[in-house]
Amino acid sequence: MAQRRSSQTTKKVKRKNVTNGVAHIHSTHNNTIVTFSDEKGNVISWASSGTIGYKGTKKKTAYAAGLAAQNASEKAKEHGIREVSVRVKGIGQGRDAARKQIEVSGISVSQIVDVTPQAHNGTRPPKRVLKREKAR
């Protein structure tokens, strides 16, 4: 008879020795995602307001974004990150809180770049809502 194999396999996290990297902060109206990568774009660590444990409207707060940045930066420091270039995308509440938390965590910030996409006369806007008067 065949032997039963264990269904769960665990992977040992390999430590990446990277000193310089890029911190991507993607802040939307509902959530903030912080990703640390090396200069080529390979992801080292990431965290979001949702992975920390917040749900619903609490995910979009600046406090939750700061905790996400703190969590991601601690993981990145374990892999050797010491200096980052911060790229901020989006218009959410947590963009400044996440950036400040990265600076406070002990990782030096070399530059801050806003890469929020700007529409150059993008898509057609929705049609205007007609206001109706109440019948007396």
UniProtKB/Swiss-Prot annotation:
An example molecular function term from Gene Ontology annotations: structural constituent of ribosome
GO terms for biological process, alphabetical: translation
InterPro entries: Ribosomal_uS11 (IPR001971), Ribosomal_uS11_bac-type (IPR019981), Ribosomal_uS11_CS (IPR018102), Ribosomal_uS11_sf (IPR036967)
Keywords, comma-separated and alphabetical: Ribonucleoprotein, Ribosomal protein, RNA-binding, rRNA-binding
Region (Disordered): 1-20, 115-136
Residue intervals passing through the bilayer: none
Keyword Chloroplast: no
Domain of life, per lineage: Bacteria
Disulfide-bond pairs as recorded: none
GO cellular component: ribonucleoprotein complex; ribosome
Residues in the signal sequence: none
Chain intervals with Basic residues compositional bias: 125-136
HAMAP family: Ribosomal_uS11
UniProt family annotation: Belongs to the universal ribosomal protein uS11 family.
Subunit structure: Part of the 30S ribosomal subunit. Interacts with proteins S7 and S18. Binds to IF-3.
Function noted in UniProt: Located on the platform of the 30S subunit, it bridges several disparate RNA helices of the 16S rRNA. Forms part of the Shine-Dalgarno cleft in the 70S ribosome.
Protein name, UniProt field: Small ribosomal subunit protein uS11
Organism, as annotated: Mycoplasmopsis pulmonis (strain UAB CTIP) (Mycoplasma pulmonis)
